[in-house]
Amino acid sequence: MTTLTKIQVYPQVLEHRLFFRDPIRVGSRLTCRERSNRVYVHRCEKKVERKRKVEKFKGNGSWDSLKSGFLGFSKLGFLSKDEYNQKVENLEMVFSSVAVQIARYIVTMTSTGAILLIGFQLSGGDSSMNSLVWYSWLGGIIIGTMTGANMVLEDHYRAGPRNVVITGSTRGLGKALAREFLLSGDRVIVTSRSSESVDMTVKELEQNLKEIMSNASESARKKLSDAKVVGIACDVCKPEDVEKLSNFAVKELGSINIWINNAGTNKGFRPLLEFTEEDITQIVSTNLIGSILCTRGAMDVMSRQHSGGHIFNMDGAGSGGSSTPLTAVYGSTKCGLRQFHGSIVKESQKTNVGLHTASPGMVLTELLLSGSSIKNKQMFNIICELPETVARTLVPRMRVVKGSGKAVNYLTPPRILLAIVTSWLRRGRWFDDQGRALYAAEADRLRNWAENRTRLSLTDAMEMYTENTWVSVFSLSVVCAFIILQSTTPSSFPGT
């Protein structure tokens, strides 16, 4: 039918049908139906629906009023119900993110403002001291903001699921790392010598993922939608098994972003003469030769990838070259692995493959506890942690690592200092005076694992503050200490 004319009719005024005897074409926002020589023009249902959606948010507080205003000036009202709900959810996430950032900077200004007032009070009105306080505050804000911005950019740059391979990941720390990567939305391959152990671990991790997703919010489920876990049996001491693992990873995941050489073994705490030849061979083969073979296999795959990748070798007792009595063989493998790591980092400088170390510290695993004495276990109460705790700290740092030659450590100086200061309170934390375990088995711990993930630790609470808060508070505290020392004269001390 030929278009004779175009008309514009506002749907709000169409309380009754309008009839046109001449053939016409009506705008796309009107619903039309032609019968012989007539066109029936109805009210635009989409615009009516849009108006209804906007009205729904009115009168329900400032938050809903803000959404109402946004909807009124947008085209969200013309979307389908599902599209509309998705857009509104995204809008709420944006508003929430903005509100969080505003709250963080309010905390920054409040925290540093309190220190600022203390500094002015201590300066006694001295203009030079006041200037020093101001410059210290401003410098802290600038440096902290730059640091925070860099961290945000790094996190944004590395956003999205990773493809991760973890050797020795059917128990202990390896399984905890696999679980943490999986629940970060990543695709994970677990390995072990035993195919039965691999199958059991895959089923267990899949069940963990289902339980988390069943109770997660819509945004969390979207984040976990790409998560996947598969497994394959692999003896890292055998080159053919390592090659099979790398080929399997490429087939299942398409590429490898992170490869963690976690497979390791120890045969207890005892003098060298009590180790059998088989014990020595197995320790050296697994800890040193296995890590070298896996590093070579991972580098071969990653060097052919446009995005490259990152390889982590696990540090342990003896990595720094210190003596390790009663674990001489284990310590020598870790020391040798550190030498290998330093060499391979220099070899790969012109490639897109990053080589790093990860140090979990002392973790309550079978590897650590094998052959340990009661005295050892009393020490473990102070500095040891559960695998889940360590994995929760290491994985976020592994996911955003850049460059090469980085060290991702759990036992940082602040954590060591905190452990020493609170050592009295940590007595009997994991073992009693007789060396009997007081902590729950892994299966029991994981029943409440999802709930425990949401609880804030001291370090988690510290990380909620922006970087410029900590830098500013530190710099201002140093200035305040300087002012106090400057204002203290020798005559203030008795006997001088």
Swiss-Prot record:
Annotated PANTHER family: CHLOROPHYLL(IDE) B REDUCTASE NYC1, CHLOROPLASTIC-RELATED, NON-SPECIFIC LIPID TRANSFER PROTEIN-RELATED
TM regions (residue ranges): 105-125, 132-152, 470-490
Catalyzed reaction equations: 7(1)-hydroxychlorophyllide a + NAD(+) = chlorophyllide b + NADH + H(+); 7(1)-hydroxychlorophyllide a + NADP(+) = chlorophyllide b + NADPH + H(+)
Family: Belongs to the short-chain dehydrogenases/reductases (SDR) family.
Function: Involved in chlorophyll b degradation. Belongs to the chlorophyll catabolic enzymes (CCEs).
Protein's recorded name: Probable chlorophyll(ide) b reductase NYC1, chloroplastic
Coiled-coil blocks: 195-224
A Gene Ontology cellular-component term: chloroplast thylakoid membrane
EC class of the enzyme, as a word: oxidoreductase
Domain of life according to the entry: Eukaryota
Main localization of the protein described in the UniProt heading: plastid
Binding positions (NAD(+)): 166-190
Catalytic activity, EC: 1.1.1.294
Description of how the protein assembles with itself and partners: Interacts with NOL to form a complex that acts as a chlorophyll b reductase. Interacts with HCAR, RCCR, SGR1 and the LHCII complex. Part of a SGR1-CCE-LHCII complex, which acts in chlorophyll breakdown.
Active site: 330 (proton acceptor)
The keyword Transmembrane helix belongs to this UniProt entry's keyword annotation: yes
Membrane-protein topology: Multi-pass membrane protein
Annotated transit peptide: 1-43
Gene: NYC1
Annotated GO biological process: chlorophyll catabolic process; PSII associated light-harvesting complex II catabolic process
Keywords: Chlorophyll catabolism, Chloroplast, Coiled coil, Membrane, NAD, Oxidoreductase, Plastid, Thylakoid, Transit peptide, Transmembrane, Transmembrane helix
GO molecular function: chlorophyll(ide) b reductase activity
